[in-house]
């Protein structure tokens, strides 16, 4: 049995804060990050009020530091229009749904070639992806549907296979009909090691998700928000291409807000999320901090000021 470094019992709880967070936010200086944090909160609140998209790009660490319950609560409150995942985020969420645990010890597993070789993750994710491809679905919807079907098949049984559905973004978004897109790099994700991995299915489903994502990005015009949280390479590159596709097809895409949240400000998020897409009109915001502190603080501010 593979050992995991993260358990669902360690996950964050949705904010149930009373008065206090708003006062804290109001007390922040109107300088640098204090000003930027307020701007991010204001942009998200404004987008929801206008009915504009609030798209959350999520890297793997956001899931494995226990923030799914916070994001699911924001889904329920209308602050998440779509979830945009890289491959790692999808893997961690899939494992949490099934086992309530994720994040293996790479140092211990790699010497014997056991890293990324968990049978259940590899087999079931690839089955879900192949089924999605056969039905003309994207990867995000396909993974959510697969997990939800497992929930239904094993409902009421002592050996239910999806014991942690409440902590899964894939399942909760699927149930709420909130789009999830998954953007992978072939060979970068552990399920690609498995004998059931089908490059055509992986590429086909992720490509459909890119098309869906581009259609969502188109709607950011005039008031939408795109947040990149914890993806340093894949999602910033995908977002930049989606922006270019939308504009190439003649659609207006200006006066929207982008937010990058990470514990370091890397080159690609800084350029491809914060700066370049908003050069022709819009606002790019960079917030630096640990996900497990910064994202719950942002969520609490949204809830209290809603």
Annotate each language-model stretch with its function.
Residues 182-219, 223-224, 240:
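Conserved mixed alpha/beta catalytic, RNA-binding, or beta-rich assembly cores of soluble enzyme
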Residues 66-70, 94-100, 192-196, 238-241, ...:
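Short acidic, glycine/serine/threonine-rich loops at helix termini
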Residues 212-215, 222-225, 232-306:
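C-terminal functional extensions of proteins
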Residues 70-75, 174, 196-199, 241-248, ...:
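Short, solvent-exposed amphipathic alpha-helical segments in soluble enzyme
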Residues 1-2, 15-29, 34-135:
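Metabolite-binding pocket within alpha/beta catalytic cores that recognizes anionic/polar moieties
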Residues 104-177, 181-182:
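Ligand-binding beta-strand-loop-alpha-helix segment within the catalytic cores
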Residues 88-93, 188-191, 265-267:
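Short gly/pro/ser/thr-enriched loop/turn and capping motifs at secondary-structure boundaries
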